[in-house]
Amino acid sequence: MKTIALVAFITVYVLLLLLPKGRWIAPVAAAALFVGVGIVPAGEVLGTVDWNVLMMLCGTMGTVDLFIRSKMPERLSDHLVNAIPSVKTLIIVLALFAGLVSAFVDNVATVLMLAPVGIAIAKKLNISPVEPIVAIAVSSNLQGAATLVGDTTSLLLAGHLKLDFLDFFVYQGKPGMFWFVQVGALATVPVMLWLFRKDKGYVAPAQATKVDDYLPTVMLVGTVAALIAASFIPGRPAMTNGFICMGIFLLGLLAECFLPRKVREDEAQGWAAQAAETLKAIDVGTLALLAGLFIIIDGLTRVGIIADISNVLSHVGGGSPFLTYTIVVWASVLFSAFIDNIPYTAAMLPVMAGAAGTMGIDQTVLCFGLLVGATLGGNLTPVGASANITATGILEKEGYNVSTKQFMRIGVPFTLVAVLSGYLLVWIFYGM
């Protein structure tokens, strides 16, 4: 059984690397194999899936889609452009703003919202939009680790360590991931000042985009507020956060479909068409991929592979928590530069628990280090994260082909500075 499980696991990751489209197929097929051969008992399959994480992800996807289509992000960006005429400063602030938005909105959605602003600025000044858009993408990836709802990897970490929304700010009486990420973001400002030192033009003021529907904004703010409030409820059900995200999305969808209001210009006519458009925005493939991975990881745990990998990691680290932590962070940076960080994080979290148990330490430092390396490591290459792929795709549609060298000119220094600061801070607060 162990050989079958190991071969299936390796095959899944090879296919995820080679076949970026239809990524859900390999994990789901492997999960079915695990059940079929008896590695995971059929009667226990549903219990292996973290439904709280899937519900949070699904609900947040839907709410974010409504938020994007309300044109509120464009309005916020327009105000930003009008307030900061200097191109160099504007690009940096736009990247930082993308990071702020990405702390609460999916990274890909953030790029889709703000890339048009960067392109519009570039066209006005007759400069290449490549560097501004890449800066937006890498900044979005950085801040995705800041909060519970910022990125799928954060949701996976929260599910593993049983974290609440506020735990990303203060955990075990110490600063949480949010503050480590902010220090990393501030550390990248000098890097961006140097990268964009030649951009000295100015942008003419533009009319702010009109927002006709403020309900999605209320929904998004309400989701964050409800998650914060739920953090204070003792003994709450395990799927509370999932029900919050799904509940607010469904209520918002019903309101969008049936409440009397002015119809947006880009909106499908009729409640059924409106609901269908919104539901299309939910990435069912990612949900299926995660469900399959949950089953696979449970199977790997049952046959002892997770324990074996944990022992190898501890052995390579020589039993030293600091050396093991260092290997976890920088190996995650390297791996995430070439493979998607979602399946990588999902597979490695149980390994962190096993390695920590072998060394007799709290797994928090290894798990936080994993998130730092896996989330920020995706910024090294154009294929390291979905937001990067989205950004380069947008640029290609505009007629700009982004080479790996062009991307890495921004991605490498940005990543090294951000990871180094996070690496040091996590160890100082959770490892020493």
Task: Cite the ranges covered by each PLM segment.
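Hydrophobic transmembrane alpha-helices of multi-pass small-molecule transporters
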Residues: 1-67, 173-311, 410-432
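Membrane-core helix-loop-helix motifs of multi-pass transport proteins
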Residues: 121-217, 362, 390-424
